[in-house]
From Swiss-Prot:
InterPro entries linked to this entry: tRNA_endonuc-like_dom_sf, tRNA_intron_Endo_cat-like_sf, tRNA_intron_Endonuc_cat-like, tRNA_intron_Endonuc_N_sf, tRNA_splic, tRNA_splic_arch_long
Record has Calcium as a keyword: no
Record's catalysed reaction(s): pretRNA = a 3'-half-tRNA molecule with a 5'-OH end + a 5'-half-tRNA molecule with a 2',3'-cyclic phosphate end + an intron with a 2',3'-cyclic phosphate and a 5'-hydroxyl terminus
EC number: 4.6.1.16
Keyword entries, A-Z: Lyase, tRNA processing
Record keyword Lyase present: yes
GO biological process assignments: tRNA splicing, via endonucleolytic cleavage and ligation
Quaternary organization: Homodimer.
GO molecular function terms attached to this record: lyase activity; nucleic acid binding; tRNA-intron endonuclease activity
Family in the record: Belongs to the tRNA-intron endonuclease family. Archaeal long subfamily.
Name this protein carries in UniProt: tRNA-splicing endonuclease
Record's function text: Endonuclease that removes tRNA introns. Cleaves pre-tRNA at the 5'- and 3'-splice sites to release the intron. The products are an intron and two tRNA half-molecules bearing 2',3' cyclic phosphate and 5'-OH termini. Recognizes a pseudosymmetric substrate in which 2 bulged loops of 3 bases are separated by a stem of 4 bp.
Length: 289
């Protein structure tokens, strides 16, 4: 029975298969002298397939503690799809053939993520395994919203009545909501036409979206800051936008993406990063490519 090594752990290849057979069929490991060398992910993958056994009964638990359940599930799914998979510095990279590897970060439900990670350390996919072991995959991409609405400078008095803001005078059609001859304004709209574009991060994002030619309405009923239409002819909002604090629990991010997916919209997380409004689109995907 041929054998191999994974760190300090010795394993044996089952069913009379050779080391070269394992390397050729599963595209994992390499030879060093007479031994097949595997990393912990590769070793566990072959163990669960019944291709190897361990010399020491404690080896399985030791290796599983090294990789964690969540990362192993991601690895196994990718391997079963025929990818070459490697873990490096906490990220999983995968590819077929010689193309550029795609990247994946595993997130637990209650992990925290910083907006700076989304823009400075981007990955192609996020992968989460819930408490019942079911995986969910999200694609991630920085985007630059580009609406079709021709924007001209807007400035008008704002009147407070009944605890709400109303626009006085002629306003552009895309600002406010008609109410018995008045124009009811959201707080962001009121700040915008008052010239107070930097009252808060939310106001800064609102102003930036308007400047990009987008039509911006409240996203409250979807649990977001805004729903965004790219043009007057849009039948439905293309985006939901939430202004993200410096750090957020992954559970909250995932919940927003799920809501957007259920109403066929793209979830965008926005924040002010290095004095610039940045946008990252996250989508729930049924399957990795």
């Amino acid at each position: 029975m041929e054998q191999g090594i994974c760190g300090s752990h010795v394993f044996f290849i089952e069913d009379g298969k050779s080391k070269n057979y394992i390397i050729g069929k599963y595209k994992i490991g390499y030879l060093s002298g007479d031994n097949l060398i595997l990393d912990p992910y590769e070793c566990l993958y072959l163990y669960f397939k019944g291709r190897i056994s361990f010399q020491n009964s404690d080896s399985f638990r030791d290796l599983f503690d090294t990789v964690t359940f969540d990362r192993y599930v991601a690895y196994e799914i990718l391997k079963n799809k025929g990818y070459r998979v490697k873990e490096d510095s906490g990220l999983i990279y995968f590819r077929k053939g010689t193309e550029k590897p795609l990247s994946l970060r595993v997130m637990r439900e209650y992990d925290r993520i910083q907006f700076s990670d989304l823009v400075e350390n981007p990955v192609d996919y996020y992968f989460t395994v819930d408490e019942e072991g079911d995986p969910t995959v999200y694609s991630s991409q920085e985007i630059f919203p580009a609406g079709r609405n021709l924007v001209s400078p807007v400035s008008a008095p704002v009147v407070r009545m009944g605890g709400r803001s109303f626009g006085a005078g002629d306003l552009e059609w895309w600002i406010g909501t008609a109410f018995h001859g008045f124009r009811l304004l959201t707080e962001n709209e009121a700040n915008y036409i008052s010239g107070n574009h930097s009252a808060s991060q939310v106001d800064m994002v609102y102003s930036d979206l308007v400047g990009r030619g987008c039509i911006v309405k409240t996203g409250f009923k979807y649990g977001a800051n805004f729903r965004v239409y790219l043009g007057r002819d849009s039948q439905h909002a293309e985006y939901l936008v939430s202004v993200m604090p410096e750090e957020e629990r992954w559970y909250s991010i995932s919940r927003g993406v799920r809501v957007a997916s259920s109403v066929r919209k793209t979830m965008i997380y926005a924040s002010i990063y290095k004095n610039e409004v940045r946008y990252v689109a996250l989508k729930r995907v049924k399957d990795i490519i």
